[in-house]
Each structure stands twice: as C-alpha cells, then as structure tokens.
C-alpha cells in the first residue's frame, strides 16, 4: 500500500431541503389551515481519527466528496428526511488546513471527531408561520446551502520512538528485529522510502517505533527524501539515533543528522535522544570501544551498541522506562498494520 501523508480534497455538504407550503384538504373541512412541513437538514461531512487506518490513501482516489441533500418538507406537517452524513476515518495525527494554509483542527486522539463541512439547515414549512392574525400563511423558506470548501490534509505520525540516522545505518533491520514490522531491508541507501511503524512488547508494555527514511545533509532543503518525513519526527516522544559503526567518521555522521534536525525545527533537537552504535558485529571489540568512547565524549551521552546477534531487549527496556517516567506524555494507541 502506498504511503500518502498529504492530500487536497474538495468537500460539499448537503443542501437543506425546502420547506413546504400546503393546506389541509379533507372532506367537510372547509378551512383546514396550513400543514406544510419543514425540510430535512443537509448531510454533513465528518472526519474521525481511527487506528484502523494509517495513511491518507483513501483521498488519492476520492478527491471530491459530496454529502446528501435534505429532502423537502411534505404536506400533513411531515418533515423531509435529513441527508445522510458522511463519516470518513483518517489516521490519528491528521491535521486539517484550509486553502490558505491555516490550521483548522488536529485529530490527534482515538475517536476524535470533527465536522469539516456542515450541512445546510432545512427550510421552514408554512404551518410554522401560522399566527392569530395570519391563519393561512402561504410563505415558506428554502433550505440553506451546505458548506463547500477545499481542504488540505497533512499526516504526522504519532509514535513513542522515532528512529533516525543516515541511509543504510541499519534502522530498518533494527525495527524488524525487535518488532513485527515487515519493512524492506537491503544493503543500499534509501531502501526505506516511507515511514514504517512497528510495535514491540516488553514486559506486557507496548512500544511504538517509527522508522523515518534516511536523512542526508541538506534534507531540510529537499535533498534526498528526508525532507518529506522530517515532520513525522515532531510527533515522536523520544528519538533513537542509530549510527553505523563501520563509518570512518561517526562524529561527522552524528553531527550531520543533528544539524538537519536543528535547521528544520529547533524543537526536534530538544527531544530526548538515545544513541545506538549499530553493526558492531563487523568490528572487533577494541575498535568498537574506541568509537564508543569518542562518541560519548562528543555527545556527553551514554552510547549503546547493537549487532545482528545481540538482543535488543536492553535498549527497548530503557526506552520504555524513560517514556513511563514522563507523566506528561499521553501515550496514544497506534495502529500496527501487521498485527491484524
């Protein structure tokens, strides 16, 4: 399935049904009086955040959405049927903008609803205009037009841990080894072309990890493919920075990613970061020790190591402990597309 995280959609809510102008006509009743009913309301278009979807691909094939009009009122004081609402599920983390780019709402929690296009109100039938001085009104009102607009949808993935690093650092391999993600893995840059989600379970605790496609120098300006996905890092609670230990200059590798984060948004550099030296099975212990020490001196942070054979449980447990310590983080439920 294609990963679509932006879409432009035309919405037209239903028009309200017209009110009815009619009079009661029955045998032996000479002056039956007005009995025109109200028109039904037009259908609205509603978006609801759901873990059942994780991409905006629905809008790739459905770019024009129109709700049903309300039915006109009828005689005998019968109200017209209201148009059916259209309710569309969107991924948790979907932001809705108007055409000018102004944020309308942010659907960032499960089952959060928002009426994006309101249906028009039904018209009033002539029976409602009857008064003591006007016993036989003939006038009625037309139904109101429903809202009509273009909107822009943008998806920012919500996850506990955002996995970042240069292309081919082993991010996808790490995700696949500790979760049930079936992401594509190969020994060349930009294997991952779209964010991948995986769910790890440590001591019955769920940890959602997002593999962000590899960033390169200049990603914030559009180089490589990272600029399309830097926004997804904003919704991650913490960052796991994976570095290929076989690189000659691991400090430069680290600084490259940190620079791109700061140039995109200073807030990204303020997120808690854990550093993982990957592919340690390709070097001897002395080389790993030297690189680990150099990186620790530069970053002033604890450096973790990983290899194909080494269990990932230790680093995952540390990540979960850190997230659980922060009571301000409201852990969302994220759909795992491979656990169905």
Curated annotation (Swiss-Prot):
Its main location: cytoplasm. Residues 159-325 form the OBG-type G domain. Keywords: Cytoplasm, GTP-binding, Hydrolase, Magnesium, Metal-binding, Nucleotide-binding. The keyword Hydrolase applies. Belongs to the TRAFAC class OBG-HflX-like GTPase superfamily. OBG GTPase family. PANTHER family: DEVELOPMENTALLY REGULATED GTP-BINDING PROTEIN-RELATED (PTHR11702), MITOCHONDRIAL RIBOSOME-ASSOCIATED GTPASE 2 (PTHR11702:SF31). This is GTPase Obg. It comes from Ehrlichia ruminantium (strain Gardel). The gene is obg.
